[in-house]
């Protein structure tokens, strides 16, 4: 595994879980953490430790979002009417980089952020280069014409390890996707269990 590939899986190793369901994840080959002490029996986590781990896993899944930004997303989820854990997931799945990843225009969520930042994506016909840009139901996301033949894009749409969820409609011939609706937690195809209610408990201490 190259240094670049290894860095992409540091979150998997830290969590001890294959959080993106990738075939090459190092945790597929071992059930212990990284480092020389990784094979020691894991001690039972405290309530705080469990909550912290849930937060780190959710942050990591969306490209290791910075704490300040993630806290701001949580704060908005808390202010909104309805269930805070559901609001949190809805806000995360509404991010432009998350939608580009879900639509299979790129192979990883990290690649999605870079792809957006480099100006390869339009929303409703306007170029947007901010990965955290929040999309609304009905928004149309498209890959710029000159970017459609990039090797990473052509390879990504062929990935068999994940499907496009039903809250996104994707046309891989035209490289266009529509964000149909904001999903509920149960709609999101996480390869591992995500526990946003524990994130709420963490920030509510």
UniProtKB/Swiss-Prot annotation:
Residues 94-157 form the S4 RNA-binding domain. Residues 1-16 have a biased composition (Basic and acidic residues). One of its GO terms (biological process) is ribosomal small subunit biogenesis. Keywords: Ribonucleoprotein, Ribosomal protein, RNA-binding, rRNA-binding. SMART domains: Ribosomal_S4, S4. One of its GO terms (molecular function) is structural constituent of ribosome. It comes from the Bacteria. PROSITE patterns: RIBOSOMAL_S4, S4. It holds the Pfam family S4. Belongs to the universal ribosomal protein uS4 family. One of the primary rRNA binding proteins, it binds directly to 16S rRNA where it nucleates assembly of the body of the 30S subunit. With S5 and S12 plays an important role in translational accuracy. This is Small ribosomal subunit protein uS4. InterPro entries: Ribosomal_uS4, Ribosomal_uS4_bac-type, Ribosomal_uS4_CS, Ribosomal_uS4_N, S4_RNA-bd, S4_RNA-bd_sf. Part of the 30S ribosomal subunit. Contacts protein S5. The interaction surface between S4 and S5 is involved in control of translational fidelity. Residues 1-46 are annotated as: Disordered. The keyword Ribonucleoprotein applies. GO terms for cellular component: small ribosomal subunit.
């Amino acid at each position: 595994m190259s240094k670049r590939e290894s860095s992409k899986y540091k979150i998997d190793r830290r969590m001890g879980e294959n959080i993106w369901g990738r075939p090459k994840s190092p945790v597929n080959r071992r059930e212990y953490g990284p480092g020389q002490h990784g094979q020691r029996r894991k001690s039972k986590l405290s309530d705080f430790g469990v909550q912290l781990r849930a937060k780190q896993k959710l942050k990591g899944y969306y490209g290791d979002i910075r704490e300040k930004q993630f806290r701001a997303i949580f704060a908005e989820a808390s202010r909104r009417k309805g269930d805070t854990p559901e609001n949190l997931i809805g806000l995360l799945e509404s991010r432009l980089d998350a939608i580009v990843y879900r639509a299979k225009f790129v192979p990883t969520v990290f690649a999605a952020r870079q792809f957006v930042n480099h100006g390869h994506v339009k929303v409703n016909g306007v170029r947007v280069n901010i990965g955290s840009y929040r999309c609304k139901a009905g928004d149309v996301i498209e890959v710029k014409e000159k970017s459609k033949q990039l090797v990473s894009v052509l390879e990504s749409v062929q990935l068999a390890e994940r499907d496009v969820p039903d809250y996104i409609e994707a046309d891989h011939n035209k490289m266009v996707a529509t964000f149909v609706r904001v999903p509920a937690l149960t709609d999101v195809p996480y390869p591992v269990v995500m526990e946003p209610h524990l994130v709420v408990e963490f920030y509510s201490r």
